Amino acid sequence: MFLLAGFLGCIYKYHEKEIVLEFGMFTGSNWDVASASSFVMIDKAIAKFEEEHPGVRIHYYSGISKEDYSEWCARKLLEGKMPDVFMVPDTDFNLYSSLGVMKNLDELIEHDAGFNRNDFFTTALDAGKYDGHQCALPYETVPVLLFVNKSLLAKEQIEVPGEDWTWDDMYEICRKITKDVNGDGLLDQFGTYNYSWRNAVYTSGGRFYDGDQQQLPFTDSHVLDAIKYMKRLNDLNQGQSVTQEDFNKGNVAFMPLTFAEYRTYKTYPYRIKKYTRFQWDCITFPAGKEGENRSRVDSLLMGINSNTKHEKLAWEFLKHLTGNEEMQMDIFRYSQGVSVLKSVTGSAQAAAIIQEDMDEGEQVINSSLLYNVIENGVIEAKYQQYEQVMNLADGEISKILMENRNADSSMKIFQRSITKYLQQQR
């Protein structure tokens, strides 16, 4: 009798054996700003999931920095111990997708009646696509906005631009702002700092790469228009270099800034360390003649190990992190990013959370502006040669601007060298 009871007990325990899902994550912020709460929202999400799924435990390794995470993943991959669900580094997304490290989610999405693609921002969801297939889901997103020094504009009796302003509008503002204030023969005020030709291309109506991630020519008219526009802006500075110190002192009108930086430096305690000498806010980027008021949008992605033994649970956990409104609201509570769900980011609750830590009288960024900037944003390519090519282009265009070279002929020569370079990489 006792033997039978013991045998039945063993069978019961076997069926009730705990399932452990491995989760891969790094500490801190994905957006290179200070963050002490990255584990809080993950731990809350895990606790909720485990509560809803008795017998399931989520395990992760703490203390892995963003800088070390890619190497940690590579080591786990070689050991055959890749986590069931994991954060996907931007630099590894295309490699992992092409090698089949991440599960193609198309079938899981198609057979899940509760999953709706339209719940997500288009740019955020598209960031997780490879070769037309959904290989990862977005967890958090951050757009680049344009920082405007409202105090400097007010001093020069210039109104803050509206959401649909243009390159010409920006040029005129910069022309009025740029001046020698103290009469020592050197400029003291400037229009822009760190505004680049890439920012201009995004708003020119052109793109660096098409949907298949084939390189568009650097001799494309939109790219050339952006470079020539940058030359006009650069000429206003009369050969002087604009520095971060100029900006910090309140002597520059515009500077690109991520939403993560906006939230960090608008709230305590970091607001007392930066940009306290003047009033500032964020607006859209100006549009070229054939372009729109667009900017880059980055997303933190999560995928499922293609070799997971717990596909259904891994899918449920991935959805729990990325598609659950309660979990996504915690992005606003504990991170400097933005929720990937339209309903959350556009909500009054999200706006109230952002407003909580701001000084009285500070106006929170317009939620409709934030919504539109993300939905209509630009996704940068993730494949290996992209940043190498763009860095080479940065150097070439810097020479065009600094040495007063002809943009058309210089970019034709550059295009030939880049085409040859890419052919050698294949």
Question: Which sequence ranges carry the predicted segments?
Answer:
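Extracytoplasmic/periplasmic solute-binding protein
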Residues: 130-139, 144, 168-216, 252-254
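Glycine-centered hinge/linker elements that transmit conformational signals in sensory
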Residues: 173-174, 212-241, 285
